[in-house]
Amino acid sequence: EIIAVTDGLGRPFQTVTKSTQTGTVKERLATLQEYDAMGRETKMWLPTPVTADYVTAAALKNTAKGSTGYSDTRPYSETVYEASPLDRVTKQYGAGAAWYSGHPVATDYLTNTVSGVLSCKLYTTDGNTLDDNGGELYAAGMLQMVKTTDEDGNASYTFTDKQERTVLTRQMNGTEQLDTYFVYDAKGNLCFVLQPEYQKTADLSLYAFQYKYDNRNRCTWKKLPGAE
């Protein structure tokens, strides 16, 4: 049995899950959802044992932090947003004080440059052949980028064009860049997916997914890396 409680604005606030096994004392686990002043979800408290179908937020928090809960000062996950009307997430913390100290998932919103890890090669295609344009790069500021840094400090980048298509995902392995490029034709059809090894050995037959389309943009041919 699940009891869902909403706040004055109709948002999910507290959920209590009750055991329905007959002949036993019904156990209850409650979760709590908190919101910031802008109405955005911020803290989600871990399921906590309670003794009633509804408990106040203060009582649930005290129980969660105490010895009958998690014995932890931060038994909740937390989402932090940038100070802008875009409501974009900048950090996400896992539950537990140990994760809060230097272990968030951090998100940065950037644009591309013409050098270093923020640069992106410009591949084009007529639908049949791939053109690397002599190693040309996208001009600075032409692509939107999202940099994600995980709990262990590993960074990855996603580059999107003005049509909101992903053109590159870059996973960092130390200082090594592992790049996967996505190449579209003039109609927006995905024609090539270049695997990271392609940047070392430009062999489409070994290191690329290839697709072809008819005049109705239906995929009529596909080739996997290494397939004959």
Describe these PLM feature segments:
Residues 1-228:
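Beta-strand elements of repeat-based all-beta scaffolds
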